[in-house]
């Protein structure tokens, strides 16, 4: 088992490394808005690059950030930060960034997908690095404003200047990440572990586990409302406990009956066959097969995603959940 020997913090980073450089943040969604405002509030020179004038354009202006068309934002930029969705980045790169960026400008990413799978092939004279906050954009902004920060990963793909890590840590400091801690990784490791986590637990695994448990109870004659509470609604409380106190803390917080049942039946359900399938899923990611399939799916208008979302929206568990929302919300204390 490999473990990092270094976690970078504020004392390892210096904003002076990028002071005076023009930073173009491409995109003004969840992460883009947070990064642009945090970097601006850290005293850095920031503009936002957008493909068209619209809601994001007006939002940036109202936040006091200068919005420009992408090609205008990148032409004078020393540092170009890609904060648009993965599947938009290649087209944006080919049409609005590569033809207009100045020679030697840094390319920065928050996720390694496009670089790792070679959907974007950067110039040989550019530093290429990544800062990947381990939290959503609004949290990155909220923590920064409160004097804290969201932990992040940092990776260097190309270090032409010899100062790529210093610049990456300066960007990380600018968004508040070094206040918490920044862990070194690689584009390969970040991409593959991120995709794996999404597929087998955070989205795919949890979704199918909840669905299977709910349907098992309903098929055996239990009330759907009761099944929903026991297999879906209570998940948040357990996840919050794990987030705040770790798995041990969660186990200490639940009943002895729950501990015993979880420790015995959990391994029966998540058995060696499931672990084997997890390794197969990881191999699809490592081989590039998943990326190849996803690029093709996206190009066809995402029929699998559209159909899957429709099935979820029309499922019994979703209908029951919607019916119970008022009941669930009614019990929340007034803030």
Swiss-Prot record:
GO molecular function, one term: ketol-acid reductoisomerase activity
Gene3D superfamilies in UniProt: 6.10.240.10, NAD(P)-binding Rossmann-like Domain
NCBIfam families to which the protein is assigned, alphabetical: ilvC, PRK05479.1
Domain KARI N-terminal Rossmann: 5-185
Annotated gene: ilvC
EC number(s) reported in the record: 1.1.1.86
Protein's UniProt keywords contain NADP: yes
Active site: 111
Species in which this protein is naturally found: Saccharolobus islandicus (strain L.S.2.15 / Lassen #1)
The protein's name in its UniProt record: Ketol-acid reductoisomerase (NADP(+))
Highest taxon above the source species: Archaea
Binding site residues for Mg(2+) 1: 194, 198
Cofactor(s) required for function per UniProt: Mg(2+)
Record: residues binding NADP(+): 28-31, 56, 86-89, 137
KARI C-terminal knotted domain boundaries: 186-331
Residues annotated as binding Mg(2+) 2: 194, 230, 234
Database matches in Pfam families: KARI_C (PF01450), KARI_N (PF07991)
PROSITE patterns (UniProt xref): KARI_C (PS51851), KARI_N (PS51850)
Summary of the function given for this chain in its UniProt record: Involved in the biosynthesis of branched-chain amino acids (BCAA). Catalyzes an alkyl-migration followed by a ketol-acid reduction of (S)-2-acetolactate (S2AL) to yield (R)-2,3-dihydroxy-isovalerate. In the isomerase reaction, S2AL is rearranged via a Mg-dependent methyl migration to produce 3-hydroxy-3-methyl-2-ketobutyrate (HMKB). In the reductase reaction, this 2-ketoacid undergoes a metal-dependent reduction by NADPH to yield (R)-2,3-dihydroxy-isovalerate.
């Amino acid at each position: 088992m490999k473990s990092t020997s270094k976690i970078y913090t504020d004392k390892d980073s210096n904003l002076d490394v990028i002071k005076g450089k023009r930073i173009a943040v491409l995109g003004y969604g969840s992460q883009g808005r947070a990064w642009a405002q945090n970097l601006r509030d850290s005293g850095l020179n920031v503009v936002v690059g957008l493909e068209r004038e619209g809601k994001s354009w007006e939002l940036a202006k109202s936040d006091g950030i200068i919005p420009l068309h992408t090609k205008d934002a990148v032409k004078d930029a020393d540092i170009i930060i890609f904060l648009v969705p993965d599947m938009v980045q290649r087209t944006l790169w080919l049409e609005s960034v590569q033809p207009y960026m100045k020679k030697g400008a840094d390319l920065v990413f928050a996720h390694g997908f496009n670089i790792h799978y070679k959907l974007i092939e950067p110039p040989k004279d550019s530093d290429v690095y990544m800062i990947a906050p381990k939290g959503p954009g609004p949290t990155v902004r909220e923590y920064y404003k409160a004097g804290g920060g969201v932990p992040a990963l940092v990776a260097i793909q190309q270090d032409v200047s010899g100062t790529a890590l210093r610049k990456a840590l300066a960007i990380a400091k600018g968004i508040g990440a070094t206040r918490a801690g920044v862990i070194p990784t690689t584009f390969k490791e970040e991409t593959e572990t991120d995709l794996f986590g999404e597929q087998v637990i955070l989205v795919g695994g949890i979704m199918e586990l909840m669905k299977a448990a709910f349907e098992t109870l309903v098929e055996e004659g239990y009330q759907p409302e009761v099944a929903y509470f026991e297999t879906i609604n209570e998940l948040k409380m357990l996840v919050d406990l794990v987030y705040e106190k770790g798995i041990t803390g969660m186990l200490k917080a639940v009943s002895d009956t729950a501990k015993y049942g979880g420790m015995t039946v959990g391994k029966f359900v998540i058995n060696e066959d499931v672990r084997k399938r997890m390794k197969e899923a990881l191999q699809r990611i490592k081989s590039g097969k998943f990326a190849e399939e996803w690029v093709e799916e996206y190009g066809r208008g995402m029929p699998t995603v559209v159909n899957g979302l429709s099935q979820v929206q029309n499922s019994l568990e979703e209908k029951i959940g919607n019916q119970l929302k008022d009941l669930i919300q009614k019990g929340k204390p007034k803030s």
